[in-house]
A protein has these predicted regions:
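Long, low-complexity, highly charged intrinsically disordered regions
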Residues: 1-10, 14, 25, 29, ...
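Non-membrane alpha-helical segments in proteins
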Residues: 7-23, 59-68
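Intrinsically disordered, serine/threonine- and proline-rich low-complexity regions
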Residues: 14-18, 52, 236
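Short coil/turn connectors between adjacent alpha-helices in alpha-solenoid helical repeat scaffolds
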Residues: 22-29, 74-83, 216-222
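Eukaryote-skewed repeat-based solenoidal scaffolds used as protein-protein interaction platforms
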Residues: 30, 34-175
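Generic structural signal of hydrophobic/aromatic residues within well-ordered alpha-helices
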Residues: 34, 38, 95, 146, ...
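Accessory, usually C-terminal, subdomains that scaffold auxiliary metal cofactors
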Residues: 157-206
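Eukaryotic acidic, Ser/Thr-rich intrinsically disordered low-complexity regions
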Residues: 190-236
């Protein structure tokens, strides 16, 4: 799943797995096998201190797990509720912790193609918070994860990772998993000291994410006045 040759990884291995899940080409038993193997291999933890080639396994494992959760959540899917409660919870926990230790900032690599660990980790968070079996009482934990990501990343996102992280918020709002009142309250609690250059980079990432939330909800005519004002006030 993390083959270093992007033509093989993107054009053959991953696309085959993703298509088989999304288009329900696997039998239920084959889907079960993929789930068991994904959990057993713990790809999100693979050489987590390393960047470069090792990141490919972590990053594309995140995309695979996102596809598995998406299929498990869809009522019209052959694999609807195919995950056991234990498997589902394991995927939730692994996905929520992944971007709290990932350190590879690479977007596109001339050597490996798209690495995009933070974008893929964000895609996994979207599937977690939007999954109907993810406890609604835990959505605040996902917001806390986002806050921790913004406060630990000491570089400026340049490959739309901040926009992918925005999907975690606006997709949860559009799917009625997260109230805009809760998002607004979370925004007012955020504190960026803005005392050095790293602080400004972190604030800039968060602000870019929130602007994307604003634009996407406004486009859907779903942006509340409360959240509109909270985002507008999120400035230096």
């Amino acid at each position: 799943i993390g083959h270093p040759d992007y033509k093989i990884r993107d054009g053959l291995i991953f696309v085959t797995l993703a298509r088989a899940i999304q288009e329900q080409l696997f039998t239920k038993e084959q889907f079960d096998f993929v789930v068991v193997e994904a959990l057993k291999r713990q790809g999100l933890l693979y050489k987590k201190e390393e960047v470069g080639q090792a990141t490919l396994i972590r990053s594309f494992t995140a995309l695979l797990l996102a596809n598995l959760l998406n299929a498990d959540a869809k009522k019209n899917s052959l694999y609807f509720k195919r995950l056991s409660s234990h498997q589902r919870m394991a995927l939730f926990e692994q996905g929520m912790s992944y971007l709290l230790y990932e350190n590879d900032r690479t977007g596109y690599s001339e050597e490996y193609g798209w690495v995009h660990a933070f974008a893929h980790g964000a895609d996994l968070l979207v599937e977690i918070i939007c999954h109907p079996d993810f406890p609604i009482t835990r959505v605040n934990e996902v917001l806390q994860v986002l806050e921790k990501i913004f406060k630990r990343v000491d570089w400026r996102f340049i490959s739309d990772e901040d926009w992918r992280l925005a999907r975690v918020i606006y997709q949860a709002v559009l799917n009625e998993r997260l109230s805009q009142t809760r998002v607004a309250a979370w925004l007012t609690s955020l504190d960026f000291p803005l005392e050095n250059s790293t602080d400004f980079l972190q604030f800039s990432n968060a602000r870019s994410c929130l602007l994307e939330v604003y634009l996407q909800l406004d486009k859907e005519k779903a942006l509340s006045d409360e959240l509109r004002e909270a985002i507008q006030l999120f400035s230096y």
